Structure formats: C-alpha cells, structure tokens
C-alpha cells in the first residue's frame, strides 16, 4: 500500500517535466513583441523607477537582475520567466487539490504546463510573472475565505496590490475580489452587513497598502499614480470620447471619438465573450448559474462554489474592461480595432480546466435551459471561429491562445464545430457530456492551441534575421553611448525595434523610411550614431564604425 502511494505521488513530477518541454520549445525564439519588449527591457534595465512610464516596479526590480548577464541577458530573462511559469503550474496544482483527487490535480497541472500560457516564457514582458501572481492571489483568496476572521482578507488585497506592481492591469480586478469578499463574508456570517463590509474594506486596504505603499517606496510620488503614465481612467476615457476625426480600419473614414468608443467597445465585448464561450462555455455558464444561486440563497458559499463565483466575477469584469480599453486606445488614435487582447486574463485558463473537471459535482440544468445555454455557446463558438480570422490581427502581443489555432480560418471553424458537437452531446446527455467536456474537449483545445502557437512562433522568430545580427553586431560599439544619441533607421517597426532591443539602451530614436531612401543631416541633428537597415543611404558627413549583411553603423561627424 505504501509503495503504491509513493508511486502515485511520483506523478507530481509529470507536470513539471511537461513544463520544461514547453519551455524548451520557445527557448531559442528571438524577440517577438518588439515595441513592448523594448519598452520593458529599457525600463527594467536602464531607467530609475520614478522615470518609468508603466508602474510595474516589482517586474523591473526582478528583471533588473539581467543586467548582470551581459550579452546573455535574454537567456537570463527566460530563466526567470521559467521559474514563474513553473510556479504557476505548482499553484494551479494547489488550487486543484482543494477540490479534486491527487491524480486529477496532477492532470490539471499537466494541462496547465501544456497550455498557451507557456508561450510568454519567451518574452521580456511581465506576462509570465503576472500569470503566476494572479494564480497566487486566487489561491490565497480561496484559502483565507475558509478562515473565521475578516482581517485575513487583507492577504488577498496585499497579493493583488503586489500583482499590480508587476502589471498595472491587475487593478481592474479589484472590484471582483472586493465583491467576492463581501458576498462570501455576508453569507458566512448569516447576513451580517458589518462583517461583509469589513471583508471588502480589508481587501481594498490590502491592495492600497502594497500598490501605493510599495509604489511610493520605489518611485516616490510617481508611484502613487494608479496607472502610471496613463493617468486616471475617467480622464483618459473623457479625452478619448472628445476626440474628433478618428480614423479606424482601412476605410479611412473619420469618426468622432465617442462613436469609435461605443462601436469598438461593443464589437470587442461580443468578440471577447464569444472567445471565452468557445474555450470554456459550459463551466462559465455554470459559474453564472452558481453566482445567481449564491445571491438568492441564505446558505454560506460552499468551497467549490466559491471558485466558480470568483472566476465568474473576474471573467465578467475583465471581458468588459479589456473591450473598453481597446476602444479607448483606438479612440485616442492608436487603432486597436483589429486587435483582441486576451493576455490580460489568460491566467484564468488553468481555472477553467479545474472548473471543467468539477462539472459533475453540480446538478444539471433542465433540458430547456441546457438547450438555451448550449445554443448560445454553439452560436458564439461558430460566430467567433468565422469572425476572428479575417477580422483580427493574430499578434502574439495580444494573446498566446489564438495566433496559431486561429491562423487558418478553415481549421479554426473545425475547432468551433468540434466544440459545438461536444456541447450538443452535453445537451442530450449531460452526465457523460460533463465528463467529455472537462476531461477531453477543453484540454485538447488548449494543448492544440499551445502546439500551434509554438509552431508559428518558431517559424516566425526561431531563426536570427539580419536585423537581429545588426543589433548584436552594433551593441559592443554603443555600450557607452546614451540611448538618446543613437538612431535606428529601417523600413519596418519590427526591424527597428529588434535592433533597439539588442542594443539595450533606453530612449533610442528611430525613423521609418522606404527602400532606397537617403537620410539627410537634418534627420540626425540630435544623434551621434546611426544604424541603417537595408538599402538606405546617408547624406551627411560620417564615419563607418562597422557593417554587416543588411546593416551599417555610422558615426555622425560634425
């Protein structure tokens, strides 16, 4: 018996071995989200906290370690990200083991290791750390909810506040955690309003202590801004709505900021909601049903129900907020109408897997309600798989789940049909349908999404391009040159930002031109060194410092 238990416990190593495999697949991938990766590396490695536009000071503090790695800083980045990804796998196991058997918890952790959230390990971005911190916050929230003292809710807020110093977008989830604490405490205390309010206040206070207390410790008064350089949400939205002549899409038709805000927000909300229903429609509908039941009943919230209510609150809040954020950015002049950003809440994917396996724990809806729910999920799945590929740009900057699986419309529609068939089977036979969806359909879609996203990413950035060589070849000559005295001239943002990333200095200027352009002296009046990419000439006194295939570094002579 003891030997059997030891053999079973050895299974705990399986998800971590799978995580290492996922990491190895993207280990050699080169920078892929160029503008963001350049901004984050510049902040973390080269700028004081008070001068950073994004208030992700904990991320910058930890990633600043890569300064000690020299030219190998990108490998160090992936090592740090790997630690946080493996932490996410472990934390997911700890969440699952609260509700499931040991073997099924190992299964959940294994699916997490093989899910699309492994992709950001390759990036110099906060995503992997953010996913880990949000998973930690969910786990801590579930743990403290079982305790008898309202004061422990502070722990949930402290963790969420720390997460906001990794990625400020965590602040969008504060209402979800406050509402959850309020409802949970209210039900647990037999409708005691004071204890419910105290729990919600405790979460808020904990958040404010870490978000602004540590923020001030890092960056002084600059650390007291809620969203860093973005300002206040109300001010940002008001300014965007008041904008005039905003051009969206390829039709070149100018519209008012308010019209763009409403149009993009509504269409993107529908797209985000449809994407979530494709990935986890049955568990999410159950989560909404459980949440409604919790509000109606006077009974304390059960442990399993707590997970569903918390995930429902986070999902609903993030779908709405991210759609509004995309609309705000578009109305402000940076067209995001063709971008669907799921990466702000892809950390929920492991929780969807746990919820899928918990479906059999709940009483099935009556057939009429199953037909209604199933019809909505099927319609949303087919709508999204048809609408997404031709409408949205498949950027890794926006999501890890969709770029691979959504690259081919025909294949994506097949995925929609695959999910829809499972939902129809669930309508007819809910007992077996729950098992099929939780144990097979959802994990299969996630693993498929990972492999296809990895394959596409490796195809795009798995081999060094000439502009990678340009960054490597010029870096050593520019080590002691301030970034604002360097200019990179190229034909695409990808080329230019890749070179800036590898040079690894803050505030490097850039200029986009067409093939065969000649750069005049006026363009480089505030630069001492210029990197040119491709067939680009210069018309000013200069000295060639170094050159290679497709690039040249020149010193401006005055």
Regions found by a protein language model. Name each.
Residues 57, 61, 70-90, 120, ...:
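Loop-to-helix entry region of an early transmembrane alpha helix in multi-pass inner-membrane enzymes
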Residues 137-152, 187:
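Membrane-interface transmembrane helices that cradle and orient dolichyl/undecaprenyl
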Residues 92-114, 132, 147-151, 155, ...:
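Transmembrane-helix signature of polytopic, membrane-embedded enzymes
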Residues 108-109, 139-140, 152-167, 174-178, ...:
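Membrane-interface alpha helices of multi-pass inner-membrane proteins
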Residues 21-23, 193-295, 311-327, 380-392:
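Membrane-lumen/periplasm interface segments of specific transmembrane helices
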Residues 27-41, 50-65, 69-75, 466:
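Extracytoplasmic catalytic/substrate-binding loops of multi-pass membrane glycan-assembly enzymes
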Residues 122-130, 166-169:
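Short acidic/glycine- and proline-prone juxtamembrane loop motifs at membrane-interface regions
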